[in-house]
């Protein structure tokens, strides 16, 4: 869904100078559908799946809009470090959220409740923290672009801009190859991240709390890695940085498979 809609949403945001407004909309959508998972349980699998799909769609679309602000916030020679700061803060936010959820589950267990009974409430905690963390963006971030004239209507203009971009892509073969490669390696990374917790629980028999601790450790190392790698990216270049991270991913996956 994100792959199919992102080009049109991006064209619409550029034409209307609406990145911030769309980011607010996607943030609200992510918060609401994450919180809605609180109301799911046995017998509501379809509803839970729909909420997960919707929350991830809004989150992923919001990530694209956030990335579109980067050229406005950082000079080309500092994009790596600024991006690294952003990802590091995001991972620290994840640590805060997971820490709060882990504390809630521990408190529930101490009170004699089953862990499974307290898990739905962590959806509300996560949604609330995500909403609070987003507030500085909407209070202080400015939309620097100016709306463009739309003589043929905004929808027609967005489609026209998208068609022009696809047509011009033929003249930028490197960009086209990069976008295709990004599609595949991001899909692989997303699959690994999504299945990691499931693998830990089903194959390694991790409890819910063990899984949360694992995610806490992963987020902590990722925060340090993103912060440091941002500076490295500015020194060695973006292409080499991506190649280095993908080699690291491949190596770690092979080692995990052999373990």
Where are the predicted features?
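Pair of pore-lining "gating" transmembrane helices in MFS-fold secondary transporters
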Residues: 53, 167, 171-192, 196
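C-terminal membrane-cytosol helix-exit motif in multi-pass small-molecule transporters
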Residues: 97-106, 128-147
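Short amphipathic helix-loop junctions that connect adjacent transmembrane helices
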Residues: 194-214
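Juxtamembrane intracellular "pre-TM" segments in multi-pass secondary transporters
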Residues: 142-180, 203
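Hydrophobic core of transmembrane alpha-helices in multi-pass small-molecule transporters
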Residues: 33, 44-62, 184
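C-terminal ends and interior cores of transmembrane alpha-helices
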Residues: 24-43, 247-259
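Glycine-rich segments within core transmembrane alpha-helices of 12-TM secondary carriers
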Residues: 81-105
């Amino acid at each position: 869904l994100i792959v199919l809609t992102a080009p049109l949403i991006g064209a619409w945001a550029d034409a209307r100078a609406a990145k911030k407004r769309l980011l607010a909309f996607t943030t609200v959508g992510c918060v609401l559908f994450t919180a809605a998972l609180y109301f799911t349980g046995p017998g509501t699998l379809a509803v839970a799946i729909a909420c997960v799909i919707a929350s991830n769609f809004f989150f992923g679309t919001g990530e694209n809009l956030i990335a579109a602000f980067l050229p406005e916030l950082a000079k080309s020679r500092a994009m790596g470090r600024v991006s690294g700061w952003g990802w590091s803060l995001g991972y620290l936010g994840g640590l805060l959220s997971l820490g709060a959820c882990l504390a809630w589950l521990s408190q529930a267990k101490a009170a004699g409740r089953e862990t499974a009974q307290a898990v739905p409430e962590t959806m509300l905690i996560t949604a609330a923290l995500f909403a609070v963390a987003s507030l500085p963006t909407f209070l202080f971030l400015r939309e620097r672009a100016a709306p463009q004239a739309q003589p043929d209507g905004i929808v027609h203009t967005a489609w026209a801009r998208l068609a022009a971009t696809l047509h011009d892509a033929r003249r930028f073969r490197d960009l086209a190859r990069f976008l295709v490669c990004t599609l595949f390696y991001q899909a692989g990374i997303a699959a690994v991240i999504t299945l990691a917790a499931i693998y830990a629980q089903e194959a390694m028999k991790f409890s819910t709390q063990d899984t949360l601790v694992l995610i806490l450790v992963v987020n902590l190392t990722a925060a340090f890695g993103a912060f440091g790698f941002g500076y490295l990216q500015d020194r060695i270049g973006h292409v080499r940085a991506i190649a280095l991270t993908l080699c690291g991913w491949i190596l770690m996956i092979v080692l995990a498979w052999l373990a």
